[in-house]
Every structure is written in C-alpha cells, then in structure tokens.
Curated annotation (Swiss-Prot):
Protein name (database record): Neuropeptides B/W receptor type 1
A family per Pfam: 7tm_1
Membrane topology: Multi-pass membrane protein
GO molecular function, one term: neuropeptide receptor activity
Positions in the Cytoplasmic compartment: 65-75, 134-158, 231-250, 313-329
GO BP terms, alphabetized: regulation of metabolic process
Family label: Belongs to the G-protein coupled receptor 1 family.
Extracellular side: 1-43, 97-112, 180-209, 272-289
Top-rank taxon, per record: Eukaryota
Residues that carry a glycan: N3, N13, N25
Species classification: Eukaryota, Metazoa, Chordata, Craniata, Vertebrata
UniProt source species: Mus musculus
Transmembrane segments: 44-64, 76-96, 113-133, 159-179, 210-230, 251-271, 290-312
Length: 329
C-alpha cells in the first residue's frame, strides 16, 4: 500500500503499480511489471527506513520519557512527533509485505487500520510543526520584549498535543471509511473504494490531502515566521533580552531544522499530487521509479528526526549517554 501519486488517476482501468492506496474502485489491479532493480531496491529501502526509524524514535521516546529535565514544552511536541513516526515505522513491514506479495493478505480491519496510520503519517508531522512554530513565535517574541509567555506550561503543551491528535483523527477518518478490500483478476487489494462518480471523489481526496495536509499548515508556518521576522526588526533588544535570546536560539534552530527536513521530504509528495491532478502521465518504468522515490522520501522523514536531535540538542545527547551508561552499569 504505497502513495504513488504520480500515476494515480480518477478514471477506469488505471493500475496503481502495486500501490493500492488511492486507487479508485473499478481500477485495474493487475500488477505492473517492475524493473528488477526497482523490485529489489524498494523493499530494501523501506526496510532500512523501518529499522533506523524504530531504533531512532525508540531512543527519543526513551530519553524524553525517562529524563526529568527533558520534560519541557518543546519536548512535549517532539515526543508526539516521535510517537507518530514510531507508529508509522511499526506498520511499515506490512507495506513491505504488500509490495513483495503484490496482494493484501491481512484482512479488511487491518486494511482500514494501515490506511489510517499511513494518513496519520501524512498529516501529523506538519500539524505538530505548525504548533511548534506557533510556540517559537510566542517564545522568541516574548524574549525580545523581555516578558514571559503566560499559560505556556508543560500541562498546556500536553493538552494542545491531545487536541492535535483529535484533529488529525477527524481529518484521516474519511480515508478509513473508504478503505476496504477489493478483488479483481484474482488479486485482493486494500484500496480506497469511492462512490460514483469515482473520478470526482478521487480528485476530491487528492485535493483534500493537498489542502489540509500541506497548504494550510505550511501557509500557517510561513505566516508565523514572516510575521516574527518583521516584528523582530522593529524591536531593539536590551541586554537581558539578548541573553535570553542566545539561550533559546538553539531550541529555535532545532525546530527550524526539523521543519526544513519535513518540507524536504514531503514537498515532492504533495507536488506530485498536483502533477497527478493536472496531467496524464504514462506508466513508464521511469515514472514508476520516480513515484517510488517520492514515496520513499516521504517515508524517510519518519527516521531522520532522531539524527537532528542527536546533532543539534546537547541535552538530548547527554541524557542518552547517561541512560545508556546507567543501563550498562
């Protein structure tokens, strides 16, 4: 079950090349012949992402949950990002099995669950990054003005995180509703079965993901940082504010790095949605290969964040070393 949006279409007799997520009902489910290098590379790449993601995000969860001094507002949001990434990497082996078997052997309940988790992966990262950007906006602006942010507490951050999960659940619910098993030419697949006219519903689902999963959160993030830069230019920092600004600069850098990596991984995926909606690309080996590359890039976001924490967060590195040394002792 792979989001290969470059050659998805809302019309009939459109194969998804082993990718069932997003295929409309009535589409041809016959497996496309994949080039041998691609047939080998895709499960290997997915397997590496799964292994690295599970190890890295497990380490992040372990450090953030076991170290009292790591219980900060920013780390609450980082913890939830790690939970979302860990959840996705836990089910990635099912995607690998689906790719290798070229059919869905896991039943309809699992089909709906995996589709939902896949969509959680699509929406949750940018939603939490939008919240983290809003938090950075408030903190940096308050620091520049030598004041505190009222109500910015660990408990409030947890409440906001729960609200984000609730919102993402509502957003991904339609995908779980439409997901079901469909069989054609002897192949059972987990697909999104849209009502008639299926072309309309398919396009609506792609626009839904593009707008709610990318355009709105990215626009919000850009607006926050643009407004922040404009306001900072108009403020003269006193010595106390400059000291606080230096102390918080590393956290802001970490959030900006996480955001940059997320956009790098997810922008091609959402741009490919625009291509799929506006063009009718032939299903050539090159197009299929590009589609799998874009999908793999979006999946890779789930395993990259722990490396950012390790390189950019001194507290995380120290806490991880201490916990590892304690367990060794």
């Amino acid at each position: 079950m792979h989001n290969l949006t470059l050659f998805e279409s809302g019309g009939d007799n459109v194969s998804c090349g082993g990718s069932s997520l997003g295929c409309p009902n009535g589409s041809s489910l016959a497996p496309l012949p994949l080039p041998q290098p691609l047939a080998v590379a895709v499960p290997v790449v997915y397997g590496v992402i799964c292994a690295v993601g599970l190890a890295g995000n497990s380490a992040v969860l372990y450090v953030l949950l076991r170290t009292p001094r790591m219980k900060t507002v920013t780390n609450v949001f980082i913890l939830n990002l790690a939970i979302a990434d860990e959840l996705f990497t836990l089910v990635l082996p099912i995607n690998i099995a689906d790719f290798l078997l070229r059919r869905w052997p896991f039943g309809e309940v699992m089909c709906k669950l995996i589709v939902a988790v896949d969509q959680y992966n699509t929406f949750s990262s940018l939603y939490f990054l939008a919240v983290m950007s809003a938090d950075r906006y408030l903190v940096v602006l308050a620091t520049a003005e030598s004041r505190r942010v009222s109500g910015r507490t660990y408990g409030a951050a947890r409440a906001v995180s729960l609200a984000v999960w609730a919102l993402v659940t509502l957003v991904v619910l339609p995908f779980a509703v439409f997901a079901r098993l469909d069989e054609e030419q002897g192949r059972r697949q987990c697909v999104l079965v849209f009502p008639q006219p299926e072309a309309f519903w398919w396009r609506a689902s792609r626009l839904y993901t593009l707008v709610l999963g990318f355009a709105i959160p990215v626009t919000t993030i850009c607006a926050l940082y643009t407004t922040l830069l404009c306001r900072l230019r108009a403020i003269q920092l006193d010595s106390h504010a400059k000291a606080l600004d230096r102390a918080k600069k590393r956290v802001t850098l970490l959030v900006a790095a996480i955001l940059a990596v997320c956009l790098l991984c997810w922008t091609p995926y959402h741009l490919s949605t625009i291509v799929a909606l506006t063009t009718d690309l032939p299903q050539t080996p090159l197009v299929i290969g590009i589609s799998y590359f874009i999908t793999s890039l979006s999946y890779a976001n789930s395993c990259l964040n722990p490396f950012l924490y390790a390189f950019l967060d001194d507290s995380f590195r120290r806490s991880l070393r201490q916990l590892v040394s304690c367990r060794s002792a």
